[in-house]
Amino acid sequence: MLAKRIIPCLDVTNGRVVKGVNFVELRDAGDPVEIARRYDEQGADEITFLDITATSDGRDLMLHIIEDVASQVFIPLTVGGGVRTVEDVRRLLNAGADKISVNSSAIANPQLVSDATARYGSQCIVVAIDAKRSSAPGEAPRWEVFTHGGRKATGLDAVQWAREMATRGAGEILLTSMDRDGTKSGFDLELTRAVSDAVPVPVIASGGVGGLQDLADGITRGRADAVLAASIFHYGQHTVGEAKAFMAREGIPVRI
């Protein structure tokens, strides 16, 4: 079995790392370069860096911050937010990103995923899906895809959308439960399982980590290939090393 990855996530706006609850109520968590360096030293497998207001604000890419982070970090760096064209993908890769995450732009133009993977390879294109439960209690579970930092409903079914993106060449799915984001109540394991079982590519579980057991559950019960977390690492509740040691004790293969 391949080693499972632990990925700290840096949500960035106006050049600062922030953390919110259910995609709002953002509070400052520090300088992205400093935080990324700390996670690299702690043994993170990768870092995900999302400019969470670039799309909704219509802003350009934060290339200078990406260059600064990439110069300090020696593990794979995934960058997303405001990526609209294949040219944007090229600029971010040139700035030092290893993988590019697309979200709202993939829905506006699904061909972007096909074109970007054709040019740069599936291994560096991640499709981020922000999903919110849309089924009523007692109904078969359904989740709707949202865009623009969770502000815009699309009417798309999250599991079907993940399938389409994998068919178009996405190398990974970064799956965030909007219902769980920032709540520290654990991943939406039903959502994570539904998408993991539906696609042939790795799924990164995101949204809701409150403790180390939640990370392990994302792998063992959610069937994710990687787990992403922010606040438990940003505010010093746990280090990446502690998370890996816990997962190893749970019998999950990790790189120590």
Curated annotation (Swiss-Prot):
Record's GO cellular component terms: cytoplasm
Active-site feature positions: 11, 130
Pfam families: His_biosynth
GO molecular function: imidazoleglycerol-phosphate synthase activity; lyase activity
The entry's keywords: Amino-acid biosynthesis, Cytoplasm, Histidine biosynthesis, Lyase
Domain of life: Bacteria
Coarse class of the protein's main subcellular location: cytoplasm
Family: Belongs to the HisA/HisF family.
Protein name as it appears in the record: Imidazole glycerol phosphate synthase subunit HisF
